[in-house]
Amino acid sequence: MKTVYEIQQFLKQFGTIIYVGDRIADLELMEAELTELYHAQLIDVKDFQTARLLLRHEIQFLKEKRKS
């Protein structure tokens, strides 16, 4: 997974569609859902780590952008 869109499509395979209207909240909910899937052993560690890193990077980018 290389984009947030790919993570959304990945989560959709598990029946999860996240949209609350706030981009940062959406990303944080995606991260929480990925964590739940990982703890339930439904996704492997590589997919989990890659997706989580990408989401955290995007969240940090958006938070810094809001401050400016």
Please give the residue ranges for each predicted region.
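N-terminal acidic leader/helix
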Residues: 1-24
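Charged low-complexity stretches with an acidic bias
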Residues: 1-8, 55-68
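Short, structured secondary-structure boundary patches
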Residues: 11, 39-45, 66-68
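Short amphipathic alpha-helical interaction patches enriched in hydrophobic/aromatic residues
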Residues: 15-18, 38, 63
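Residue-level detector of alpha-helical recognition elements and their boundaries
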Residues: 22, 26, 49, 63-66
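Short, charge-rich amphipathic interface segments used for partner binding and complex assembly
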Residues: 29-61
